[in-house]
């Protein structure tokens, strides 16, 4: 059944300046509207490596909601567990500067409580034969609890990302039950009540190793933008994965692609360092294009012996 991904769908509204961006001023530019959301991007990234993931989520009961389902089906994502409900999708509004980085953003989260009912009815069917589980940690508490219960029942690995760290902090105790948690440097600072902005990757890796051990977590990865990423495991092993050097067009979705690559590697036999390397390659492929998901790859390009099912 492949990797099961759970989370929310967003509509991304992105504004780009045509000339030098003036904070607080009027800026002529272009505006794009695309399908987004951390987990929606992640499931499409996984599908673009010719793997066949399953998406458990919600969409609006409108034409836009159907468009989201149609696009995912075109990429060979199993969409049978996507429910259509009123106001099922969130909205993310972002303004980019001239370097392709987000200058300001605001989001409206959807109500994801219907996922709890869906998992009560079909949880065994969804998780019994899956290869692994990827989840947004800031879903409803009951939903996260259900997923972790099914993971224990069927002995499945669970990997977690985050879209709103303030909400995810309320689920901090669940991190001990997650096989690998991935977030960025700022989010890691919130998680451990510290400021890591001044640390080099090597220093960050050492700090992370201590924090992962003391918090009784299995493993964790922190992305550091252009400096790459660092990882640490409960046994104290840690390391740095340098970023790939590419021309930046649009950074949207790079973190999601990194998470997708890391999940793919850890699911299909790679160690944490090798998995982060896959994540780094997928992230680089997103940064240098205008899309917020990676282009098509084949598993063998990452040393994965996974049969491609057409």
Task: Give residue ranges: language-model regions.
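Glycine-rich phosphate/adenosyl-contacting loop at the front of the ribokinase-like
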Residues: 1-58, 63-67, 74, 92
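Conserved phosphate-binding/catalytic region of the ribokinase-like
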Residues: 3, 27, 194, 198-310
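A glycine-rich helix N-cap at a beta->alpha junction
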Residues: 71-86
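Conserved phosphate-binding/catalytic loop of the ribokinase/pfkB sugar-kinase fold
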Residues: 84, 94-132, 137
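Conserved beta-alpha-beta core of the PfkB/ribokinase-like small-molecule kinase fold
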Residues: 132-206, 227-228
């Amino acid at each position: 059944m492949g990797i099961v991904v759970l989370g929310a769908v967003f509509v991304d509204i992105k504004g780009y300046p045509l000339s030098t961006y003036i904070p607080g001023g009027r800026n002529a530019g272009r505006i794009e509207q695309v399908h987004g959301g951390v987990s929606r991007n992640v499931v499409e990234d996984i599908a673009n490596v010719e793997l066949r993931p399953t998406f458990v989520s919600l969409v609006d009961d409108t034409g836009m909601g159907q468009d989201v389902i149609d696009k995912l089906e075109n990429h060979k994502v199993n969409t049978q567990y996507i429910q259509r409900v009123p106001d099922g999708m969130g909205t993310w509004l972002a303004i980019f500067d001239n370097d392709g980085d987000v200058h300001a953003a605001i989001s409206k989260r959807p109500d994801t409580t219907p996922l709890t009912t869906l998992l009560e009815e079909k949880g065994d069917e969804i998780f019994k034969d899956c290869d692994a589980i990827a989840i947004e940690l800031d879903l409803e508490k009951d939903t996260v609890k259900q997923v972790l219960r099914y993971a224990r029942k069927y002995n499945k690995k669970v990997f977690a990302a985050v879209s709103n760290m303030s909400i995810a902090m309320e689920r901090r105790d669940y991190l001990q039950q997650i096989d690998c948690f991935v977030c960025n440097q700022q989010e890691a600072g919130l998680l451990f009540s510290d400021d890591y902005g001044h640390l080099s990757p090597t220093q960050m890796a050492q700090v992370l190793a201590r924090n992962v051990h003391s918090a009784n977590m299995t493993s964790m990865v922190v992305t550091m933008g252009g400096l790459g990423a660092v990882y640490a495991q409960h046994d104290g092993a840690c390391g740095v994965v340098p970023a790939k050097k590419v021309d930046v067009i649009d950074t949207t979705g790079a973190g999601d692609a990194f998470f997708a690559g890391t999940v793919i590697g850890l699911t299909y036999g790679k160690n944490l360092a090798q998995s982060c390397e896959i994540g780094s390659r997928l992230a680089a492929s997103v940064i240098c294009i205008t899309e917020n998901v990676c282009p098509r790859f084949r598993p063998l390009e990452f040393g994965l012996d996974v049969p491609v099912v057409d």
